[in-house]
Amino acid sequence: MQHARKKFRVGRTSAHNRCMLANMLKSLIHQERIETTLPKAKELRRCADKMITLAKKNTLAARRLAVARLMVRYNKLTSKEARQAKAGDLSAYNVDRTVINKLFDQLGTRFVSRNGGYTRILKLQNRVGDNARKCIIEFLAD
């Protein structure tokens, strides 16, 4: 029996979970709406609410915490990104910068008057292949 088990585990290692949630959180901040499975969305909601609370503070320490939690790479380019940068395409590299700026400049100011509950989960039909519960997670309008 596993009483009070609060960790998000779906058969992946902890490093994989951490990276997956960071990538999903970046996508959610960038697009403000993503489609995923219900267990992932419930865990993502916890992370997103914490990030918005950080963004509402809008201090240097809060920005540094957000960069660390989102695993943003400002000065490191992978070999693929380096090839793209030589060709003049920095889209993958600039997404991380725009995510942090959007989090603090737009989303943080949008939810200043709200004390919590910044996201909404809308349930969809189950996925055809494996019958997984699908949903849409999105930020509220204001």
UniProtKB/Swiss-Prot annotation:
Any GO BP annotation:
translation
Q: Which NCBIfam families match?
A: L17
Single GO molecular function: structural constituent of ribosome
What are the annotated GO cellular component locations?
A: cytosolic large ribosomal subunit
Q: Which gene encodes it?
A: rplQ
Assembly behavior:
Part of the 50S ribosomal subunit. Contacts protein L32.
The family database entries (PROSITE patterns) matched by this protein are listed as:
RIBOSOMAL_L17 (PS01167)
State the UniProt keywords alphabetically.
Ribonucleoprotein, Ribosomal protein
Report which superkingdom the organism of origin falls in: Bacteria
Pfam name, any one = Ribosomal_L17
HAMAP family assigned to the protein according to its UniProt record, in alphabetical order: Ribosomal_bL17
Q: Which family does it belong to?
A: Belongs to the bacterial ribosomal protein bL17 family.
**What protein am I looking at?**
Large ribosomal subunit protein bL17
